[in-house]
Amino acid sequence: MDIIQAKDIIIDFIGTKLEGTGIEGAVVGISGGIDSALVAYLSVEALGAENVLGIHMPEASTPKSEIEDASKVAEALGIDFKVINITNVLEVYRTAMPDIDGASAHVDGNLKARIRMSMLYYYANMFGRVVMGTGNKSEILLGYFTKYGDGGVDIEPIGDLYKTEVREMSKMLGVPESILEKAPSAGLWEGQTDEDDLGVTYETIDKVLQPILAGEGQERVHLKLGVPMEEISSILLRVRSNLHKRTTPQIAYLDDLRGDWLS
């Protein structure tokens, strides 16, 4: 799909989702990365700068450059912007749960994501706004997000854009160059990057997922793209094993009902 057409669809989606709800504004967690920057830009175009609140939530290991880039986005868009350091909140958790000192980087990182989600909803509830998701299609398919953390949102405006498409649209909308050029990172621990964590680049991930979702087999994708079968299998294993992250919690129905009770 043409990237301009995709942008128009997303902007219409944002407006339609809020229409008739009595809610006019949005809260966006602006990390300093490309996904949240794009969501902020799209939200402003859909709702107006006066109706978008950006919140940056660093902690002790957050690079200064992330705070600077998040601030650039807010300044460029003219939106209200808050910086809330979550280091003290993390320390309260660590004091209350002594076992947390032995937690892996992933476990600790997931806690940070869930604290941030709670803060976004606090402000959304306070001002009667929605929490905008910043997940892209590549991450959502791979399950590369924290359940009830950065995955805990009201709507996902860029959830049907692959990471490579996010970059293309961000460049078109004028997202700052420092954000476009940096290595993608969830910022869950010091020095973390998405592609080191995943073991494969987003370019490869997207090249594999697009034909697979269009119905092509793994062998054909391997021969056509030259991507090793091990990488293709690894990507698809992530997609399958993280299905639970893309669905709502399952209910143990006591009869044959399999949808909503009122549907």
Swiss-Prot record:
Name of the protein described by the UniProt record: NH(3)-dependent NAD(+) synthetase
Species whose genome carries this gene: Methanococcoides burtonii (strain DSM 6242 / NBRC 107633 / OCM 468 / ACE-M)
Presence of keyword Nucleotide-binding: yes
Oligomer status and interactors: Homodimer.
Encoding gene, per UniProt annotation: nadE
Classification via HAMAP family: NadE_ammonia_dep
Any coiled-coil regions, as ranges: none
GO CC, any one term: cytoplasm
Protein residues bound to Mg(2+): D35, E139
EC number of this enzyme: 6.3.1.5
InterPro entries on file: NAD/GMP_synthase (IPR022310), NAD_synthase (IPR003694), NH(3)-dep_NAD(+)_synth (IPR022926), Rossmann-like_a/b/a_fold (IPR014729)
Gene Ontology terms describing biological process: NAD biosynthetic process
Taxonomic lineage: Archaea, Methanobacteriati, Methanobacteriota, Stenosarchaea group, Methanomicrobia
Pathway as given in its UniProt record: Cofactor biosynthesis; NAD(+) biosynthesis; NAD(+) from deamido-NAD(+) (ammonia route): step 1/1
Residues binding deamido-NAD(+): R114, K147, D154, H244, K245
Reaction equations catalysed: deamido-NAD(+) + NH4(+) + ATP = AMP + diphosphate + NAD(+) + H(+)
Keywords: ATP-binding, Ligase, Magnesium, Metal-binding, NAD, Nucleotide-binding
Cross-referenced CDD domains: NAD_synthase
